[in-house]
Amino acid sequence: MPNYTVPPDPADTSWDSPYSIPVQIVVWIIIIVLSLETIIGNAMVVMAYRIERNISKQVSNRYIVSLAISDLIIGIEGFPFFTVYVLNGDRWPLGWVACQTWLFLDYTLCLVSILTVLLITADRYLSVCHTAKYLKWQSPTKTQLLIVMSWLLPAIIFGIMIYGWQAMTGQSTSMSGAECSAPFLSNPYVNMGMYVAYYWTTLVAMLILYKGIHQAAKNLEKKAKAKERRHIALILSQRLGTQVGVSLMLQSKAEKEKAEEAQKDSGYTSNQAGDANNLRRFGFSEPETSQFRVDPNSNNNLNVEGSLNTENDQNLGVIEEERSGFLSRRESNESYYPGPHPTAANSRRCSEMEKVSLLSESDGVPSTRPAKSYGRLSLRSRYSASESITTTHENDEKEVEKADSLQKLFADDELGSVLNFKEEKLKNTDSNNDSDTTSVILQRSRKYKKNKRPRSSRRSEHSTPRQIAKVKQAEGTAAQLIEESVPDDDQTETIEVKRTDRWVVSMKKRIARALIRRRSTTRPERGSSSNSDDSSSEVEGEEKPEVRNNGLKIPQLTVNNENRGETSSQPGRDRLAPPNKTDTFLSASGVSRKISTISTVITREKVISSIFAPIAVFNRGRKQTKAEKRAHKAFRTITFIVGFFAILWSPYYIMATVYGFCKGECIPSFLYTLSYYMCYLNSSGNPFAYALANRQFRSAFMRMFRGNFNKVA
C-alpha cells in the first residue's frame, strides 16, 4: 500500500519523470503485460466457473471466484496507477480525490485477498478433518454470506482509516511535496498494529491450518495403507491355512500310498471298488473271484488264487491262466460289442470255447493270454487278426469267427489311442482315491512264424487223457462262474459278422471325430512312436504294441511274456522281463507309476501362485480412497495458494512494519518499490495456482484456449 500524501498545490501534479523515454517504454511494456495477464487469467477463472458445471456445483469454489474477482480489480487499478507514481519520481500527478480512492481500493482489495485465502484454507481443513460435520453445516447461503463479509469488513476498516482519519484524530493531512500516502502511516504503532492484526495473524492461522491439512492427509494415507496391509494379511492367512490343509491332506495321501505299495507282492494290485464300478459300466455284475496277482516266487508268473484247486500245480497254472485269459477276452469284446447282454446260453458256449483254448494251450501252442484285472483294464492291447481258434465243431468255429471279428475293433491305431486310458478314467481314479494302486496290465499277443504247425495236430500229439480230464473237471466251475458274473437275459445273440463290421466302421468314424475335436483343443505332444503300422514288428519272436506318448506321465505296470522254448516241457510260460525288454504304455521313460504325481505337481504350482498372488498388490499403485483424494486435492490447492501468498506478500509487510519507525530512511526506496510489485504479482500468479492444483480448472482453461466457451450442462 502506498505511503504517500497528496500535495495541496495543484501545480505540483504535473508530469516530470526523472527516467529516460526508453526506460519508461520498457517499464510500461512490462507493466501492461503483467496487468493484462492478471486481468485475463482471473477473468478465465470466473468464466470457468460459469461454463463448467463440475466447478460451479462445488460450493467451495465460490471462494476461488471471490479471490479471482479481487485479483482482477487489482490488475485493473493496481499495476497502472502505481507505475504512474513510480515513473513520475514518487509524485502523484492525479489529484487528492484520486489518491484517496486509489488508496482505499488498494488496501481493501489486498485485505479481501488475505481474508479469502484464509477462508479457502479453513474450508479445505474442515472438509478434510471434519468432513461429516462440515458438509452438513455447509450451504450455498452460508458460503455466500462469508464471501460478502470478507468484502465488507476490509471496506469498512480502510474506509474509516483513510476517509475518517482526520475526523477521528483532528489532525490535518500531512503534506510533503507530491507524496500520496495513507494518513495512519504517520503513527508507527497504529501502522504496526494493523499489519500484525490483519496480515501476520492471518498468515500464522493459515500455516496452522495448512499443517493440519497435511497431517490429515498423512494420517488418511497411513490408515489406508494399514487397512490394506491388514486385508492382505487376512487373505494370506486364509490362503496359507487352506494350503496347509491341502498339504497335510496330500502328505497323508502320499503316506497312505507308500503303505499300500509296501503291501504289494509283485508291484501292482487291483482296487476292488474301481473294479466293481468298471464291471457295472461294462454291463457285468461284480464277480466273486478273488483278485489276480503275480507271484515272483512261483515258476508261473500268472497264478490264480481262488476257486480252482488241483493236485498238479503245473497243470493248475495252465488251466487257470487259460480260464482267466478267456474271461478277459470275452469281457473286453462284450464291453464294446453293441449286441445284447450275455446270456446263460452264451455262457455255455463260452465254456466250450474255453475248453478248446485250454486244450490248445496244453499242447504247447503259445497263445495270447492277457492278464486279468477287475480294475481299470488297459484296452490298448491289440489282438492279432491272424490268430484264430480251430475247433472240431461248427458252432465253436462260428463263435470264434465272431470273436475274431471283434478283434478288428482293437487292431486300429486311432481306436486304441482313444479307448486306452482316457482322461475321464483318470478323473475317475482321482475320485476313487485309488489312482496309485491302479495296475495297467499291458496285454500283448505273440505270433510265431517259425515252425508253425496246425493246432489240431499239436493237440493230438501233446494232449493226454489226464489233461483232458482236468479240463472237463474245470469246465463246470468256469461256466458257473461266468453265469454268476453275468446278469440274466432272455435275449439271444443274433448279431451277424457283417453287422459287427458295420458297427466297427461307424465306431471308427465317431472316434475319429472325437480325436479331431480333442486335438483342436488340447493338441498333445506325440512321441516318435505315434505312427506305427498295423502289422506288428517282430523282435525276438514277440509282438510289441504301439506306443503313443501324449506328454503325460502315466503310471504303468508291464508284464513281459518271453518264450523260453517251443518244447512240450515248457509250454509258453510267462515271466517278468528285465527292464530293457519291457514295453512302455503312454510313457517315454517307463519309470513313472503314480497318477497322483501329475496332480501333485499342478497342486504345488497352484499353491505357490495362490500364496504369492496378493503380493502383486504391492507392485502396482495403491488405489486411493475418497477421503484420501479429497485430502490430497485440498493439500495441493492450499500448497500453491498459500505458498504464493506467503512468498509474495511477506517481504512488503516486513518492510512496511519497519518503515513507520525509521521514516523510510533505513529501507532503500528500490527494495520498497519491488516488494510492493510483488504483492501485485500474487494476483497474477493465482490463476496458475488454480490450474496446477485443480484438474477441473485446467481442463476448462484448455477449452477456452481452443475457443470453446460453451456452457457444459
UniProtKB/Swiss-Prot annotation:
Tissue distribution: Expressed in head region of the larva. In adults, expression is seen in the periventricularis magnocellularis (PVM) neuron.
Cytoplasmic side: 42-66, 123-144, 211-633, 694-713
Residue ranges, compositional bias (Basic and acidic residues): 320-333, 393-403
Keywords tagged on the record: Cell membrane, Disulfide bond, G-protein coupled receptor, Glycoprotein, Membrane, Receptor, Transducer, Transmembrane, Transmembrane helix
InterPro entries per the UniProt record, alphabetical: GPCR_Rhodpsn, GPCR_Rhodpsn_7TM, Musac_Ach_rcpt
Residue spans of biased composition, Basic residues class: 444-457
Cellular component, GO annotation: dendrite; plasma membrane; postsynaptic membrane; synapse
Disulfide bonds: 99-180
Glycan attachment points: 3
Taxonomy, superkingdom: Eukaryota
Gene Ontology biological process terms, A to Z: adenylate cyclase-inhibiting G protein-coupled acetylcholine receptor signaling pathway; chemical synaptic transmission; G protein-coupled receptor signaling pathway, coupled to cyclic nucleotide second messenger; synaptic transmission, cholinergic
Residue ranges that the UniProt entry lists as topological domain Extracellular: 1-20, 88-101, 166-189, 657-670
Cellular localization per UniProt: Cell membrane
Summary of the function given for this chain in its UniProt record: The muscarinic acetylcholine receptor mediates various cellular responses, including inhibition of adenylate cyclase, breakdown of phosphoinositides and modulation of potassium channels through the action of G proteins. Primary transducing effect is Pi turnover.
Family from the record: Belongs to the G-protein coupled receptor 1 family. Muscarinic acetylcholine receptor subfamily.
Protein name: Probable muscarinic acetylcholine receptor gar-1
